[in-house]
């Protein structure tokens, strides 16, 4: 009952972890920004990395050493993954936002003072991660990867367009946040406004999407 299963005992132990978690977010996003120039401007051609689902030793994940030289890591081009769906209105809008973001970071890069401003870096890092998430969605769409979070064989173009409507909206909100940063320069504020766009939402398609989601209500049952 209420007297036996109290929440406060759990809360007292868990609440102290929240500041640590928040600090981790800032640190991780600051580290992510080291990848930004090489990632956005990636033009090199590299062999495609296959999906592996075999039972193999993956201890290397936990023995990667210090986070040195992150800014020198090379990436394959991210754009082809998105361009295969650029005929979808929200994917096209998102690509335009990414181009505007690339122009911002290349022409109005963070100043030395801003590189010490965690609030500014957090907003910039969140904008950058949207591009990475979008690439992962497009690469996984329609792929069968049983037992993984990227198992999406049933994802249709309608699903992709609806997901990118969220990306477009989120990037716009983050751009407003960047525009309002106290340390932002006039040039950065002007460039941030170029990222603001409205997603394309078709009423009939939206209703079909909602109906599909509602059909999944109570479909999942927790294993015993």
Describe the residue ranges of each PLM region.
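Flavin-dependent oxidoreductase catalytic core characteristic
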Residues: 1-224
